[in-house]
Amino acid sequence: MRIGLIEFLLILAIASLTVGPRVALFVDRWMRRANRANAMAARRRAEYAAQMAAERDAMLKRFRTASTVFGVGILLVLVYALGFRPIDTPPQIYKAPDLRQETGAMQTAVSTDRKTRLELGEYQGVDCIRTKDGLLYAAAWNGAALKKRTSDLVRTDGGHAAAILSVEGELTGFAFDAAGDVWLTQLTTAGGTLCRAKHDSWGAAVEQVVTQLDGAPLGAVSAVEVSPAGKVYFAVAAAAGAENGLESALRTELLAHTATGCVYVYDPAARTVEKVLGGVAGAAGLALSPDGSTLYVSDLGSRCIWAVDAAARELTAGGRGCTAAFAGLPGYPGALAADTDGTLYISYRWARSGWLEKNADSTLLRGIALRAGQNTQERLFRRTADAPCAEAVSLATGAWEQTFTGLAQDSCAAVCPVESKVYFGAAGADSLLAANR
């Protein structure tokens, strides 16, 4: 049977009237269910986002709290480390020395030309220079840390250099006696030692002579001088330890100003040690007058040179029997050298520090500097290009004859006049620099 268009439309109308409401109801229910599902999913997403935001805020709050606590802890540790941590050499209050007027002495620049230098070899510093029989001798060292440091006594004729003896640690000073023996001040992590070395064509033999005083190890031995009578004078920079070498010990004493440096004399015949001078704020150098009657002592922190009778005993710096031969110096005096013509050469370890002496009557900032470590302390003491590295003064008249400037290194550690030249040694130098006199 054929269904016409009208019949087909009637069938669709009947079907829509019969099934349509159910389909509409089904679609409506499905849409409602879908909307409810979407709403629930949206609520879950919102709840999850709110939960995540709350957790994030809580985590940030905990992190901020932890950061604050950590920062406060670090600050407290830093305050303790720099301001309250116990140190071996607490700073002492002292009166800063005056600064003398200009002397009008002749100005001489240390030559920087490599042709005028005396090369010693691969070394990191020079602590002492002496001359004997037309040859120059220098105490040169290698090794950044004292426990790894070795030192050589190097002899040079101006063209060839050779090490004649070697020691562990730092060879801070040496001097020849009338018999040709070498007296050495040696510094190791265990303390200081006064030694005697005999040298011949077969080599050198080093003998320890003084290793302790009153049962305690020697401190930072800094210099040695032998009198015409054979007495051996040696200086201990300060009572503080010297685990980082002589330069470090001298910087520590400059900051602390404990005035515990001493000068002793050893009698080889009697094998006795006696104190000559105490109360020195950094005994950094020694020299004897040409006749051996007067002993000159560098006082680093007081920026002066003390003069005492070489036969005197148990004196105190600035007290009876001890006079300031040269005071108000423009730098911190170190090594000394007295020429046979009566001229005293004074080397300056560092230039005068205005900051240090401004805080002489206060211990707070100096205590912080002492606790801050070696790198910070090294930056505190420098020498500008125009600052004197050494001066020459007449012992007879007290007239300042010559001022030497232009040493490239920060610390002038050694000075030695030889004929028409003056030779200088410094920390960080592998050669001897020269200037005319």
State where each predicted segment sits.
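Short hydrophobic alpha-helical membrane-anchoring segments
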Residues: 16-21, 77-85
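Membrane-spanning helices that line or support transport/gating and their immediate boundary helices
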Residues: 25-34
